Amino acid sequence: MVLVPKYLNFESDLAESVTNSMDSSLPDETTSDSIILTTFNDFSNWARLSSLWPLLYGTSCCFIEFASLIGSRFDFDRYGLVPRSSPRQADLIITAGTVTMKMAPSLVRLYEQMPEPKYVIAMGACTITGGMFSTDSYSTVRGVDKLIPVDIYLPGCPPKPEAIIDAIIKLRKGVAREVHERKDKLRQTRRYFTLNHQLEIVPIIHTGKYDEHLFSKFSEISIEPKLNVSPQRIEKSKSSISSQISF
């Protein structure tokens, strides 16, 4: 590669050229400039990052934000994304929404049917950690990375379409720097892939016993009538009411 900037020599006041010590990228000087020299790995990465085909997988409100990308306002076709309905034709799955225990085997089956190399974007708080269902829900998976490996985490409730585009751009940058042999080493070796979250452990508050002190206070209070009404007066009022109803 040759750089030809100009500078002035203060002694001779003449313009001279500066040539760096790097060799030319062309094999020889007769090679045309229209030839591009690259490696097969770089060419494969360029082709894959320019044509990511996502699998439509939405189970909650996050998918509404993802569906807005298809419209003309955001137009994610400019990034080469073509939505597919079959996992065998997709290389990207965006899990948008809550993943339940009943849906977990189906999600794993869809991921296994996708051809290699394949990528996963976890979209939304419900997909990443379970969201608002992570405290006391018996049927929610606390993170989709317990089922399949995740490449990009996209937090939000729900994330905006601009955030989804930013996640896709970051995934494209990761694909551009990827080495095929390195991706094979990271392939899932067991059915349920588990990752430990870096979250702070807090004491359990939903134990069902946090209202016992309130119930004990109410049980100690004795309710006594403040009006001293004789039983004869009560019977007299009942008879008068019944006589009025009969008329």
Swiss-Prot record:
Q: What is its EC number?
A: 7.1.1.-
- Positions annotated to bind [4Fe-4S] cluster: C61, C62, C126, C157
Per UniProt, the keywords (alphabetical) are: 4Fe-4S, Chloroplast, Iron, Iron-sulfur, Membrane, Metal-binding, NAD, NADP, Plastid, Plastoquinone, Quinone, Thylakoid, Translocase, Transport
Q: Does the keyword Iron-sulfur apply?
A: yes
Cofactor remark from the record? Binds 1 [4Fe-4S] cluster.
Q: What Gene3D superfamilies does the annotation carry?
A: 3.40.50.12280
What are its GO cellular component terms? Answer: chloroplast thylakoid membrane; respiratory chain complex I
Looking at its record, which EC class is this enzyme?
A: translocase
Membrane as UniProt keyword: yes
Q: Which GO terms describe its biological process?
A: aerobic respiration; electron transport coupled proton transport; photosynthesis, light reaction
Location(s), subcellular: Plastid, Chloroplast thylakoid membrane
Q: What does this protein do?
A: NDH shuttles electrons from NAD(P)H:plastoquinone, via FMN and iron-sulfur (Fe-S) centers, to quinones in the photosynthetic chain and possibly in a chloroplast respiratory chain. The immediate electron acceptor for the enzyme in this species is believed to be plastoquinone. Couples the redox reaction to proton translocation, and thus conserves the redox energy in a proton gradient.
* Family (UniProt): Belongs to the complex I 20 kDa subunit family.
Q: What's the subunit arrangement here?
A: NDH is composed of at least 16 different subunits, 5 of which are encoded in the nucleus.
This protein's name: NAD(P)H-quinone oxidoreductase subunit K, chloroplastic
